[in-house]
Amino acid sequence: MGYVKFKDPQTGEMWRSDTDLHLIRESVSVGRPDVKTIELEIPGASGLLDCSEIFGKRLYDTRPVAIACGKTIADRYAQDSLVKNALHGKRLQIFLSEDLEHYYLGRVSVGEFAVSAGIGKVTISAPKCDPYKYRAEITRRSVTVPDSGTLEVVLQNEFMPVAPTVTATAAATIAFGVVTYSIEANKAYKNLDMELAPGSNLLRIYAAAGTSVMFEYQEGSL
């Protein structure tokens, strides 16, 4: 049956469905995010002009997540309060035991707690989670510029478009496709024009030999 972990990204506090909330996970439903579309009617022309990828990428709406739980309990009201006090109304990371390397992020709502024949039933839902499931750990890649002063780096990205935060121990220039920008030493930079695509992304670094450069970014997938 598995379990669910809920984590508050602000405080780091975590609740596991079975050991902390004393719930048995019965089923999980993870909906798909609808595609955001931009369609224009062209007077005098048949059909529609589809501009959905005018920004060079697919865009998505929110997605729903719902977890149905049950539990044999002696005190319905104590159980109801325990779960609602922990989760209800909070924007939380939701981890499923089948895929603990990713989490969904959304505002959680705890439904009505019903009891029938001593069995408690409750649905915990997050109807408007972010469209992507995020990697549990931020991706970090550190490289060192060789004596030549030039280094090619390939950054792997799961799927979600993301611009990495770049920090260097000395002044450096980063080139990515047609985008080139300079960074100062020991300052964090994020250039939204340097957005990683799914898969392999080639960058070039120009800096003094021995300069260390750190790339940090949040990966995600549908």
Model-derived regions: residue spans:
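Polar/acidic, low-complexity leader/linker segments enriched in S/T/G and N/D
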Residues: 1-39
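Short polybasic amphipathic segments
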Residues: 2-8, 92-94, 173-176
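Short, acidic/charged, Gly/Pro-enriched secondary-structure junctions
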Residues: 5, 66-109
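Mixed-charge, glycine-accented linear interaction segment located at domain edges/termini
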Residues: 5, 10-11, 127-130, 195
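Short amphipathic beta-strand/extended segments with alternating polar/hydrophobic composition
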Residues: 14-22, 103-110, 182-185
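Short beta-strand and beta-hairpin "edge-sheet" elements
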Residues: 30-31, 89-132
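Oligomerization/assembly interface segments of phage tail-like spikes and tubes
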Residues: 38-43, 47-73, 118-132, 201
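Intrinsically disordered, low-complexity segments enriched in serine, threonine, and glycine
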Residues: 132-222
